């Protein structure tokens, strides 16, 4: 079953990709498409790469989840691009850094 891009997952355990190789991570310029919390407190942020490489959900690193949600909402409401550092470009990977681009 393919996850719905409009709804973050309820359980991260169901997203196990055991045995599959991850896409490389790094720095990317993205548009924030959506952002918000899940029932367990995880913050999910939907990002679309400005170059079209991906358009999917990512989770904010737990130690900075409130700050990342605030940054994502600021970018979303201001229609700004964000520069993010991702562990991988695979869906539901972790966002480690996020900066709004002026």
Language-model features: locations:
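Exposed beta-strand/loop interface patches that mediate assembly or binding
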Residues: 2-102
């Amino acid at each position: 079953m393919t996850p719905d891009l409009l709804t973050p997952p309820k359980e991260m355990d169901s997203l196990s990709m055991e045995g599959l190789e991850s896409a490389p991570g790094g720095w990317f310029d993205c548009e924030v498409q959506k952002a918000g919390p899940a029932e367990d407190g995880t913050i999910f942020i939907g990002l679309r790469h400005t170059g079209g490489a991906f358009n999917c959900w990512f989770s904010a690193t737990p130690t900075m989840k409130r700050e990342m949600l605030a940054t994502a909402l600021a970018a979303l409401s201001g229609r700004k691009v964000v520069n993010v550092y991702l562990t991988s470009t695979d869906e539901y990977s972790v966002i480690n850094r996020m900066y709004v681009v002026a």
